[in-house]
Structures are given as structure tokens and as C-alpha cells.
């Protein structure tokens, strides 16, 4: 998107940090106005993270104006806030490509710009990395500053407090800027949020009181101040630049600032994305999960639903309103969410942890040590399994099958449609011997009608098509693509349904009848469902060629789900071509 100089006269001049610093302080309010307007114009066309960036315009301008970035280290936590930062650091005319294939990365990305010090996507990482950078800067002796902008709920995660606990005893030259907009993606909850509200209220009533939880961690606490007052921010940052101790600056902002609909409903406007047609009756997998949860809760008061700050995205909004005493939003605290569920299970309750695949990685030890080792019946509803698309490598849910499959006693189910997802959720809910997983993709189902709940026999697959010579074993939501490829190849197609326990009886039968086996999954091949098939075949000394189709040993960049599937040959034509190429070797 090109600049219209008449529409953005100041911003068109200050298209780089070097030129930004040539502006007078008096010109900065107009720059902020134009930057906000430009962000509105661009994101309304291109889609992407929206409300968070609007809330940090003044903070971004002031930081780059006062500090010597990129010599000084500026870290963003979470990366949703970084759109204004990208615009001011030489990427303004490319901002329209953000989240698109071969376009700008959706979050700060080290390979994209020298101003992006730390690649981010998950929350609460900046203070740890910032402390390391600050210690290194101190040893360097060049008076290099390190600033971490922490917002959108990132301060609620345990990792942030682990870092602050460490930073408080080291006393490095580190500035933590707390962007307090009272929101993550959903509304912030918890005791910390109440403490921040207490500090905001005290500031309104008295200037004498100046104690906070951060001072007890040996941080110099400053604030709270208005995060939209550009002149005050310049004044404050000029002072903090000269400090030689660990500081936390508390700034009050409004998520969605400058666009009234986003100010009034920052959850809805957190991201602007393509909407499904209002006339479409096809449910998303998240919708199916949410409705199933409500249906179970109608007759079971012991079912407890847990989410780490992803209520809306996981389809739990209706449940949270209808069953508030059975709903727990633990904030951005994935480790706590899992062990909290373990405690509920020990007490005889039926916990369901709803979590995105990419965020479950953060609680891996808890899954093993606190749930699986103790054989606790915790159901994990893993949303966004597989390719998620536009949010890129930090959010692709492609590692879960590999890191979960090796855990003893766990049941892993991969539905191929929304009705199968519903039945698997019920099967996991009824399973009492240990943890169970239902792993489903982002987006809509295929239009299957939902049938009454019933148990699926553990480890039992379904034959979807009978063909010759080739048997395709599909795990998960790529079944439709696999079916089209199987038709072209006249291959047998099996909906495996379970990654663990694997339907080994079916594999044995297929090995006696077919010349080739092909496995398909929407995840990394290494250690995944296909690897489980390979291991079984080798253990039984079966001499049968097997082709594993999935994602390669690399991080998958951003783009639409369809583009990525095409690029990695997971669409029908790609699957067919990959099999034909393999057969021709």
C-alpha cells in the first residue's frame, strides 16, 4: 500500500526511525494521528491483528524517538502490538502484505528486520530474553539499553514472573514497559489484574502511595501514567534512559484506541479476518466443541472446562455464560492450566482443557508428570491442530502428534469431520484410564450433520473406500483430500481415527492384501502418526514399502491454509502426485 502524501504528510516523511528523530516534539501528535489512520486504512483492507496496535501508537513513537534503536534493544511481547513498530522501521509500504504468503511476518521476526531483536509469537518471553540482552550489554560496556514492552496479558504468565524474580536480584539496566490495557485476546482476569486496577485507582486518589508487587520484586516502579500522552511519554522515557537499575514503567492504554467500535469491543476487533458467509450453516470445529461442552454440562455438574485466555477462539463463550461455576479462564498460564486440571481429576471431577495446539507445547512437562504419569482422566481438546495459516511458524499446530505420541498411556484421536469430532470428545470424556486427546483443525467442518453422542471403540479405524494395490491410511481432517486422491489412484482409503492406540489389526490385514501403504497427516512426519505405522511394521518384520505424507522437518511460514497445503502437496492433486512420484522410483 503506497503512501498518499496528502493524507499522511508527517508519516510519509517519518517512514524510518532516522527520519522520525528529525521531527520536532510538537509534530509527534500529528504523526500519531496519521499512524493510527494509516493502520486503520491498511488493516481494514489486508486483515490482521488490529486493536492491540492501535493501543500502542504513542508508546511506539515515543520509544523510537527517545531510544537509539536498533542499537538499543526493543522487544515486543506479545507481537500483536508490533504493527506500528513495523511501519516506523522502514516497512510501511509493505505492511499491506502482512500475514500473506511471502509478505511481512505477522509478528516481530529477526530475519525480517534488524529492529526486530527477538522473534515472537507466544507470550511472556521478552523479560527473560531482555534480561539476557541487558546482562550482555553490561559486559559489552557500550551503554546499550534494553526495553521490553509487555502487554495484552503477557504479564499474567508464570514465565514473566520467573524472569522478574531473577532480574530483581541482578539489577541490570532493563526497562519493562507494562502496557496495561486490561486485555489479552480475551479480558484479563486474576489477582494480578485486580492488583493493577488497585494501582490505577490509587493513582487517581493519591500521589503519596507508591508501592506495588513489582517493588517487592526489587524493580523500581514508575506510574501508572497515561500511555496515550505523547509529551508525557517522551518526558518519562528521557528519564528512564538515564536510569541504571531495573525498572518497570506502568502505562495505561486503551486497546483499539482511536476506533470506537474496537474500543467498545476489543475482543471482536482483536483481529480482522475474512468472515464466513452469514448464510453458511457449516459449523467450525470450535463451535462443535463449545456446543458439545454445553450439552454435557446440562446433565453433568462435574465437568469442568479450562482455558488459558482463549475463551472466544476456542468456542467457549456460551459455556462460560451458561455454566460460570464450571468454567475457568486461568489467563495465559498453560502450565498451570494442565496441573490445575490434574487436581480437579484427583478430586473426582472431569476436567476438559481447551487449548490451541501451539500453546500446549508450553505445558509439556505438566502433561507427562502431572497427568499421564498419574493416569488421570483429563480430556485435552486441542484446537488449531495442523496448519493454521496466516499467523505463521509460531502458531502452526504441527508438532503435537509427535510430542504426544511418545507419552505412555495417552489416547490420541484425530477426527476427519465435525461429527466424528463430537463423538471423539464424548469418547474422551468417558475414558477413565488416563489422559485423552481430541485434536482438530482450525476452521469449518465439511457440513456433516451431528448425530447423538456415542462411544467410539478405542483404536478402531473405518474403511472409507476399497481399491487395489495401494492402501492409504489417513489421520485427521485431510480425509477429504485423501479421498479424492484415492479415487484417482483407485486406492483403498482408511480413516484411522486413532494415532494411539493404533489399529494394528487393520494394518496387518492391509499388509497381506496390498503392495504399498501410504500414511497422511497434517503435521510433521518426524515422530508423527506415520512414524507409528512404520515402527509397527518394522517390529512385525513386514516387508512392505511405506510412504509417509505430511510436513517436512522445517518451520512452516505464513500464508493461507489452502496455499500452504498446496505448497507442501497436501491438497488432492499434491497427494496424488506425491504417491505417483514415489511409485515411479
Curated annotation (Swiss-Prot):
**Pfam entry (one):** Transketolase_C
Name the residues that bind Mg(2+).
152, 181
Keywords (alphabetical) are: Isoprene biosynthesis, Magnesium, Metal-binding, Thiamine biosynthesis, Thiamine pyrophosphate, Transferase
User: Cross-referenced PROSITE patterns, in alphabetical order?
Assistant: TRANSKETOLASE_2
User: CDD domains per the record?
Assistant: TPP_DXS, TPP_PYR_DXS_TK_like
**SMART domains according to UniProt:** Transket_pyr
Q: Which InterPro entries match?
A: Dxylulose-5-P_synthase, THDP-binding, Transketo_C/PFOR_II, Transketolase-like_Pyr-bd, Transketolase_BS, Transketolase_C
Against Gene3D superfamilies, the record matches this protein to:
3.40.50.920, 3.40.50.970
Tell me which cofactor or cofactors this protein depends on.
Mg(2+); thiamine diphosphate
Recorded metabolic or biological pathway in which this protein acts: Metabolic intermediate biosynthesis; 1-deoxy-D-xylulose 5-phosphate biosynthesis; 1-deoxy-D-xylulose 5-phosphate from D-glyceraldehyde 3-phosphate and pyruvate: step 1/1
**A GO-annotated cellular component:** cytosol
The Enzyme Commission number assigned here is: 2.2.1.7
Q: What is the catalytic activity of this protein?
A: D-glyceraldehyde 3-phosphate + pyruvate + H(+) = 1-deoxy-D-xylulose 5-phosphate + CO2
- What GO MF terms are annotated? 1-deoxy-D-xylulose-5-phosphate synthase activity; magnesium ion binding; thiamine pyrophosphate binding
What is the recorded function of this protein according to its Swiss-Prot or TrEMBL entry?
Catalyzes the acyloin condensation reaction between C atoms 2 and 3 of pyruvate and glyceraldehyde 3-phosphate to yield 1-deoxy-D-xylulose-5-phosphate (DXP).
Q: What is this protein called?
A: 1-deoxy-D-xylulose-5-phosphate synthase
Q: State the species of origin.
A: Buchnera aphidicola subsp. Schizaphis graminum (strain Sg)
